[in-house]
Amino acid sequence: MRKIETKKLAAAVTALALCAGVLTGCGGAASGTASSTAASSASSEASSEGADEMAAKNVADLIDAIYVQERNEDTDAQCEAAKAAWDALTDTQKELVEGENADPDYFGRDTGDASKDDARNQDDIGDNELLVVSFGTSFNDSRVKDIKGIEDALQAAYPDWSVRRAFTAQIIINHVQARDGEKIDNMQQAMDRAVENGVKNLVVQPTHLMHGAEYDEMMEMIDTYRDKFESVAVAEPLLGEVGSDATIINQDKEDVAKAVTAAAVKEAGYDSLDAAAADKVAFVFMGHGTSHTAKVSYSQM
């Protein structure tokens, strides 16, 4: 009887040992599967991040290629390629765009509705053209309000003349074209357009502040085309002629100084400069600055 019980006990112990082995084996398999899954997930995530970075770098390189560039035969295609590549990115990838000059704001920043602007690059100019030349801005709302506002005012004042536009900053032209599809003429394009349209009388009105580098470059371009027209006239920039030293202040500078001061006083909520002075209010006017000899204009102002 005791032999039978001993055999039963031995059988039970053996069965338990076998079950334990099976259970241990199952647990090991589960652990291995979990580790494998985690490794696979990490690898997939790393691969995805690498793909995101590569896509973002591609766009950054395309932006850098057009950011500061003299216009050439590839500019139009490069602008289109950069925008198409940007549009194909995910939101996550767009945040990763970073290059020498490139960043997410190049395409991603909302500066207003470009459709409200008018590039004024149409043909059918006629005999008389009034070319408004500006440095330019890539901020759509500002361009519509300021530059287009000036152009529209000139067109209303001189209805017998065709008002056209040119920007002197190719960096701005490329940005607006790539982001918004709006093609604005640079100086050479605008002058070529005038010649091709048979313009006889050309008046150039710059919106530049002073006789700086941009104004000088504009004049150099105009001089190469003077013999293509019957007459060419170029207006002064806003602050007029520079003057030989800080003590020589022309009427243009005096008029501008009075105008901006009056605007600042009004914006601050005062009826007069004296009223602002009584409240010990000071107005500070800030300029961009320049290494050009025209920097004396700031002292004159």
Which residues fall in each region the model found?
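Bacterial Sec-dependent N-terminal signal peptides
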Residues: 1-13
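Residue-level recognition of short, structured coil/turn motifs
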Residues: 23, 91, 159-160
